[in-house]
């Protein structure tokens, strides 16, 4: 199965067309040649949104002028299906097989595992970044997770607004407390469940990439008790002017041997941990969706030595429906050169 991708007035691409085979495809080229834009366009076609910016900022710029419109077409040449995303004068539309929508319906979305350069800082970055990473993955396997996250964030915001008032109704606070406790427990338990599955696979995956016998694990640090009843008890026992417990405080650590990886592992070892994590996530997604899932890797191998880079590209989980970008590539896999 191959796809034909066409971009018009999309970022730096005026009118660019490329065929993407079903096997691992590596997009190479210098910075500024539009590699990430190709990844973004595919993500847009399958998910109906961009992780980089809003739709208006995607417009191609020539000098000081911005184009009035942009368009992405992605055609599955085997199934003879086409996805078209159009944006013009603030209006966007999604067309799938001649049916047009103002937003891409959930039933029309295709699962995508996205890995971007910022994810390489998972070990050193903030708990927020780590939560966002695992949530992005869970949401691809369980669509209700994102809806519950959105609702949880709204409830958290409203509860904090109420707590900051000099006078508020205890009954109203109780309503927010109940919703907060239930959602926080659900989200944290789901995160713990997936992190535990990943942790059980992490050492073997790391050892395959690194060629070592190092033990690597994940350790979940919940931001609150795991049951809604226990969370409710903590909330009613404290009336701080800010919600200090809950799923918004969840975190997880990478354990390398007996110590936290960011303290004892080398830079290369840390990056290999992340690649092992990504490979596991890809395997889990493929177990659920088969070859339907698409893997997008944006500039993640820049600091790997040659042998680890080859080991990464040779992992079975990346051999089909995977597109990655890199500055340069020398090898046997299919590649596309830009610039």
Predicted regions and their residues:
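Walker B catalytic acidic pair
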Residues: 298-300
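An accessory alpha-helical subdomain
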Residues: 115, 121-210, 221-223
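Conserved NTPase motor "head" modules and their coupling/switch loops across ABC/AAA+ ATPases, GTPases
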Residues: 1-30, 174-294, 303, 307, ...
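Conserved lysine of the Walker
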Residues: 35
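Structural recognition of the conserved hydrophobic beta-strand(s) that form the central parallel beta-sheet
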Residues: 320-328
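A short helix-turn-beta junction within AAA+ P-loop NTPase domains corresponding to the substrate/partner-engaging
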Residues: 332-339
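Nucleotide-state sensing region of NTPase/ATPase domains
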Residues: 44-129, 138-141, 145, 199, ...
């Amino acid at each position: 199965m191959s796809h034909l991708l066409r971009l018009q007035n999309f970022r730096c691409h005026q009118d660019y067309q490329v065929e993407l085979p079903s096997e691992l495809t590596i997009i190479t080229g210098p910075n500024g040649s539009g590699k990430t834009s190709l990844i973004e366009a595919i993500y847009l076609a399958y998910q109906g949104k961009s992780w980089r910016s809003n739709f208006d900022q995607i417009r191609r710029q020539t000098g000081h002028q911005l184009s009035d419109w942009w368009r992405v077409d992605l055609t599955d040449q085997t199934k003879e299906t086409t996805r078209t995303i159009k944006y013009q004068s603030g209006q966007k539309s999604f067309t799938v097989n001649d049916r047009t929508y103002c937003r891409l319906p959930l039933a029309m979305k295709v699962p995508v595992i996205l890995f971007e350069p910022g994810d390489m800082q998972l070990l050193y970055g903030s708990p927020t970044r780590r939560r966002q990473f695992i949530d992005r993955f869970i949401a691809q396997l369980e669509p209700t997770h994102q809806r519950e996250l959105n609702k949880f964030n709204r409830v958290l915001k409203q509860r904090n607004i109420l707590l900051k008032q000099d006078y508020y109704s205890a009954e109203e606070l109780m309503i927010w407390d109940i919703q907060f406790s239930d959602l926080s427990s659900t989200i944290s338990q789901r995160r713990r469940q997936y992190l535990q599955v990943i942790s059980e696979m992490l050492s073997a995956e790391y050892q395959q990439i690194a060629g070592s016998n190092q033990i690597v694990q994940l350790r979940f640090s919940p931001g609150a008790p795991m049951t809604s009843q226990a969370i409710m008890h903590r909330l009613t026992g404290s009336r701080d002017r800010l919600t200090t417990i809950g799923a918004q405080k969840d975190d997880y650590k990478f354990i390398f041997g007996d110590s936290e990886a960011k303290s004892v592992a080398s830079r290369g070892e840390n990056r290999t941990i992340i690649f092992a994590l990504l490979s596991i996530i890809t395997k889990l997604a493929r177990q659920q969706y088969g070859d339907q899932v698409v893997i997008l890797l944006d500039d993640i191998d820049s600091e790997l030595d040659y042998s680890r880079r080859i080991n990464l590209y040779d992992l079975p989980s990346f051999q089909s429906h995977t597109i990655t970008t890199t500055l340069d590539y020398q090898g046997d896999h299919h590649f596309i050169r830009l610039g």
